[in-house]
């Protein structure tokens, strides 16, 4: 299982937890497992076509998955994913 660090903006969707565990062989599967176990996160993470929302950044062991293999990036036992929704301001 991988550990997912949950940002404050998503914590209400996972019962207030700062970290949750999820299973999967790659980033996409781990995030889908998160969405299965915490359905309120699905629309916050994924677009209608099943792709990761463009404003959501995901890091695997401090590496941006966009520069790795995206949602196909392999996840090993004990790995940590960090979800960081992009923030905009003015």
Predicted regions mapped to residue ranges:
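Ubiquitin-like/PB1-type beta-grasp interaction modules and other compact soluble beta-rich domains
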Residues: 1-89
């Amino acid at each position: 299982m991988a550990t997912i660090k949950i940002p404050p903006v998503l914590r209400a969707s996972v019962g207030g937890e700062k970290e949750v565990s999820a299973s999967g062989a790659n980033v996409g599967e781990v995030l889908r497992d998160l969405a299965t176990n915490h359905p309120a996160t699905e629309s916050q993470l994924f677009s209608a076509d099943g792709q990761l929302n463009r404003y959501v950044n995901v890091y695997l062991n401090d590496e941006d998955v966009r520069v790795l293999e995206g949602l196909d990036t392999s996840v090993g036992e004990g790995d940590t994913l960090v979800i960081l929704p992009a923030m905009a301001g003015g």
